[in-house]
């Protein structure tokens, strides 16, 4: 293991939230990240501001990332899920202060319509978005987040059917 790899493993995880946002057809909102040339699709996620509860952070991040807060929380994950970003990305993300994220996930029912979604927010994270079926979700997600997404799907799957 290289010294830089050991150093990265010593970094903490950034506390955050993730949102599995469902429409009326039980399809899941996914956005294509604006900050990469590769096809990096993901569900909305973001950091927790100090003093903020995870549920408040989830609804704030939903508004910030999809331009709408029309929805309600169906469930909160029982666990904090974590993932490591590839080591070459660490210096480019969060000022190099974190090795990845530790997230509480929320299943959210979107009560608006497609016209309520506006990814052209003040700090856009996505340049495209769409609704994905549960079956296709794991195949389009960026690979280093796939294991986390599998765990989230497993936890929420019975509530989506």
Curated annotation (Swiss-Prot):
CDD domains: NUDIX_Ap4A_hydrolase_plant_like. A motif (Nudix box) lies at residues 46-67. SUPFAM superfamilies: Nudix. GO terms for biological process: mRNA catabolic process. Keywords: Hydrolase, Metal-binding. Gene3D superfamilies: Nucleoside Triphosphate Pyrophosphohydrolase (3.90.79.10). Its EC number is 3.6.1.-. Residues 12-154 form the Nudix hydrolase domain. The keyword Metal-binding applies. One of its GO terms (cellular component) is cytoplasm. It is an enzyme of class 3 (hydrolase). GO terms for molecular function: metal ion binding; mRNA 5'-diphosphatase activity. Its cofactor is a divalent metal cation. Belongs to the Nudix hydrolase family. RppH subfamily. Accelerates the degradation of transcripts by removing pyrophosphate from the 5'-end of triphosphorylated RNA, leading to a more labile monophosphorylated state that can stimulate subsequent ribonuclease cleavage. NCBIfam families: PRK00714.1-3, PRK00714.1-5. This is RNA pyrophosphohydrolase. The lineage of its organism: Bacteria, Pseudomonadati, Pseudomonadota, Alphaproteobacteria, Rickettsiales.
């Amino acid at each position: 293991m290289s010294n830089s790899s050991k150093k990265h493993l010593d970094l903490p995880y950034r506390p955050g939230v993730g949102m599995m946002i469902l429409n009326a057809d039980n399809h899941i909102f996914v956005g294509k990240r604006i900050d990469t040339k590769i096809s990096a699709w993901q569900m909305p996620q973001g950091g927790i501001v100090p003093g903020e509860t995870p549920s408040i952070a989830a609804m704030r991040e939903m508004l910030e990332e999809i331009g709408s807060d029309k929805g309600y929380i169906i469930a909160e994950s029982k666990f904090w899920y974590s993932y490591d970003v590839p080591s070459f990305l660490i210096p480019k993300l969060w000022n190099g202060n974190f090795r990845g994220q530790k997230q509480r996930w929320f299943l959210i029912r979107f009560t608006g319509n497609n016209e309520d979604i506006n990814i052209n927010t003040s700090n856009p994270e996505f340049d495209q978005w769409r609704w994905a079926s549960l079956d296709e979700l794991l195949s389009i997600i960026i690979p280093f987040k796939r294991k986390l997404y599998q765990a989230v799907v497993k936890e929420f799957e019975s509530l989506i059917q």
